[in-house]
C-alpha cells in the first residue's frame, strides 16, 4: 500500500461537475493519494492511516493530529504503474477493484477513528483534482 501525501492550502475533487470532496482549512491540510497492491490488508491500511495522522510535515513540525488538519483521500491505482518496459505503463501491480476499494475505505475510516476530518473522492471515477500545494511538500508513505 502506498500513500502519496501532499501538504496543501486547499484541495478539491470533482466528479461529473460536482465537488464530491474538499478541504479548505484555515491553515494547512493534507491530500492523500492511496494506491493498493496485491497482498495489502486492513492492518496495513490502519498502520498507514496512523502514520499519516501523526506525520510531522505541517508548519513548525506539527502533524495533522496536532493541528486537526483535514485530509482529502483520493484512490490512485496509478501509484503502482510499472514503466520499466516499453512506453505504456503496466498496471499489474495494482490490486483489483474488489480488493482495493474496501482497503481505501478502511484507510479513510481508520483516519476518522483517530479523530481526523476526512473528505474523499469516488473510487474508480474519473476525477478532477484541484490543489494548492504548500511548500511544496510531497512525501511517499509505503508499507
UniProtKB/Swiss-Prot annotation:
Its EC number is 3.1.1.96. Pfam families: Tyr_Deacylase (PF02580). It catalyses: glycyl-tRNA(Ala) + H2O = tRNA(Ala) + glycine + H(+); a D-aminoacyl-tRNA + H2O = a tRNA + a D-alpha-amino acid + H(+). GO terms for cellular component: cytoplasm. It is an enzyme of class 3 (hydrolase). A motif (Gly-cisPro motif, important for rejection of L-amino acids) lies at residues 135-136. The keyword Secreted does not apply. It comes from the Bacteria. GO terms for molecular function: D-tyrosyl-tRNA(Tyr) deacylase activity; Gly-tRNA(Ala) deacylase activity; Ser(Gly)-tRNA(Ala) hydrolase activity; tRNA binding. Keywords: Cytoplasm, Hydrolase, RNA-binding, tRNA-binding. GO terms for biological process: D-amino acid catabolic process. Its main location: cytoplasm. It is found in: Cytoplasm. An aminoacyl-tRNA editing enzyme that deacylates mischarged D-aminoacyl-tRNAs. Also deacylates mischarged glycyl-tRNA(Ala), protecting cells against glycine mischarging by AlaRS. Acts via tRNA-based rather than protein-based catalysis; rejects L-amino acids rather than detecting D-amino acids in the active site. By recycling D-aminoacyl-tRNA to D-amino acids and free tRNA molecules, this enzyme counteracts the toxicity associated with the formation of D-aminoacyl-tRNA entities in vivo and helps enforce protein L-homochirality. A Gly-cisPro motif from one monomer fits into the active site of the other monomer to allow specific chiral rejection of L-amino acids. HAMAP family: Deacylase_Dtd. Belongs to the DTD family. Homodimer. NCBIfam families: D-aminoacyl-tRNA deacylase (TIGR00256). This is D-aminoacyl-tRNA deacylase. It comes from Mycobacterium marinum (strain ATCC BAA-535 / M). The lineage of its organism: Bacteria, Bacillati, Actinomycetota, Actinomycetes, Mycobacteriales. The gene is dtd.
Amino acid at each position: 500500500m502506498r500513500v502519496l501525501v501532499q501538504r496543501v492550502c486547499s484541495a478539491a475533487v470533482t466528479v461529473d461537475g460536482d465537488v464530491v470532496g474538499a478541504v479548505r482549512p484555515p491553515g494547512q491540510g493534507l491530500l492523500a493519494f492511496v494506491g493498493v497492491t496485491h497482498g495489502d490488508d486492513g492492518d496495513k491500511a490502519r498502520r498507514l492511516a496512523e502514520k499519516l495522522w501523526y506525520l510531522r510535515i505541517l508548519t513548525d513540525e506539527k502533524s495533522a493530529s496536532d493541528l486537526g488538519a483535514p485530509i482529502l483521500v483520493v484512490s490512485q491505482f496509478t501509484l503502482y504503474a510499472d514503466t520499466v518496459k516499453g512506453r505504456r505503463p503496466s498496471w499489474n501491480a495494482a490490486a483489483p477493484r474488489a480488493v482495493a476499494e474496501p482497503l481505501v475505505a478502511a484507510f479513510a475510516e481508520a483516519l476518522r477513528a483517530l479523530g481526523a476530518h476526512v473528505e474523499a473522492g469516488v473510487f474508480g471515477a474519473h476525477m478532477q483534482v484541484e490543489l494548492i500545494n504548500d511548500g511544496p511538500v510531497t512525501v511517499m508513505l509505503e508499507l
